[in-house]
């Protein structure tokens, strides 16, 4: 009986996802827990028509794979909690 119980406990532990979910910034100073399978944080920046007035557009979030940069975009990815802060949050 003890062997059966021990086996059930081991199977339960192996089947459960005991790892922590990744936390990424989704907007300025707004961290959010990523969905299962999304193991990367990304920062995407690009210029639009108003870039000369407002600066670059910034998109932050979680991803399963690093987004591919289109022409004119810069994309960076990382895999630690809160590793993609908004550029205005970064220490100077």
Curated annotation (Swiss-Prot):
Primary localisation category: secreted
Record key words, sorted: Acetylcholine receptor inhibiting toxin, Disulfide bond, Ion channel impairing toxin, Neurotoxin, Postsynaptic neurotoxin, Secreted, Signal, Toxin
Which protein, by its recorded name, is this?
Long neurotoxin 73
What GO molecular functions are on record for this protein?
acetylcholine receptor inhibitor activity; ion channel regulator activity; toxin activity
So which residues are the signal peptide here?
1-21
UniProt lists the family membership as follows: Belongs to the three-finger toxin family. Long-chain subfamily. Type II alpha-neurotoxin sub-subfamily.
Its job = Binds with high affinity to muscular (alpha-1/CHRNA1) and neuronal (alpha-7/CHRNA7) nicotinic acetylcholine receptor (nAChR) and inhibits acetylcholine from binding to the receptor, thereby impairing neuromuscular and neuronal transmission.
Q: Which GO terms describe its cellular component?
A: extracellular region
Which cell locations does it reside in? Secreted
Database matches in Pfam families: Toxin_cobra-type
Which InterPro entries does this one have? Snake_3FTx (IPR003571), Snake_toxin-like_sf (IPR045860), Snake_toxin_con_site (IPR018354), Toxin_cobra-type (IPR054131)
- Please list the disulfide bridges: 24-41, 34-62, 47-51, 66-77, 78-83
User: What domain of life does the UniProt record list for this protein's source?
Assistant: Eukaryota
Tissues/organs with expression: Expressed by the venom gland.
């Amino acid at each position: 009986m003890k062997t059966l119980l021990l086996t059930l406990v081991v199977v339960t532990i192996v089947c459960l996802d005991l790892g922590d979910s990744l936390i990424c910034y989704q907007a300025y100073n707004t961290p959010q827990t990523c969905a299962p399978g999304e193991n990367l944080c990304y920062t995407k920046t690009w210029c639009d028509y108003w870039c000369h007035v407002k600066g670059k557009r910034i998109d932050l979030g979680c991803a399963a794979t690093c987004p591919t940069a289109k022409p004119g975009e810069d994309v960076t990815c990382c895999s630690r909690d809160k590793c993609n802060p908004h550029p205005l949050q970064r220490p100077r």
